[in-house]
Every structure is written in structure tokens, then in C-alpha cells.
Amino acid sequence: MKIACTLVLFVMLRCYVNARNIPGTCRTHTGIILLSGEEWKDPNHCSTYRCSIFDGEAELEGVTCAAYHVPPHCRLVSAANELYPQCCPTVICSDKSR
């Protein structure tokens, strides 16, 4: 019997980025420009970003999966080709009592 544990912990990243010459916008690390209130899910890094205005400045907020400590008899399994949060890893542990 296997026990699947999904940890719902998130890491919040913040950076202040304005897209060049376009007030009220943010630019992602890949160069995508987001308007205030828009969200973008990064398909290569299992994270999501949202552009918002804070104190009159555009702010790009990012959220990604938590870091995991995998106990003995367990393994980390990721869902390939999924977007955040479905791409976050799950800890799968085997039942050693049998």
C-alpha cells in the first residue's frame, strides 16, 4: 500500500519590475509584459506570476512550489507537462509495515 502526501506549501517571491516605458505594467524574466491584474504561469519553472500596483509602482509577484525534505522510504514525484500548481511535486511513501 502506498500513501501519497501532497504538501500544500507555497513560497512567495517578490520583485519590483516595470516594463520599459509602459506605466502600470510588469515584465517577466522571459520578457512577457503583463498589465496590472494579469497573471502568467511559467511552463518551464512551475510557478505563477501576477502583476499588481503597490504604492503607485508595478510589482511582479511570483509563487512557486515549496522545498521538500523527503523522508526515508519516500520519493518525490513531479507531474510533467502541467502548469502551477498541478506541476508541484508530491511525496510518495511506501508502507513498510507489511
UniProtKB/Swiss-Prot annotation:
It comes from the Eukaryota. SMART domains: SVWC (SM01318). Keywords: Disulfide bond, Secreted, Signal, Toxin. It is found in: Secreted. GO terms for molecular function: toxin activity. InterPro entries: SVWC_dom (IPR029277). Expressed by the venom gland. GO terms for cellular component: extracellular region. Residues 1-20 form the signal peptide. Contains 4 disulfide bonds. Belongs to the scorpion La1-like peptide family. This is Venom toxin OcyC11. It comes from Opisthacanthus cayaporum (South American scorpion). The lineage of its organism: Eukaryota, Metazoa, Ecdysozoa, Arthropoda, Chelicerata.
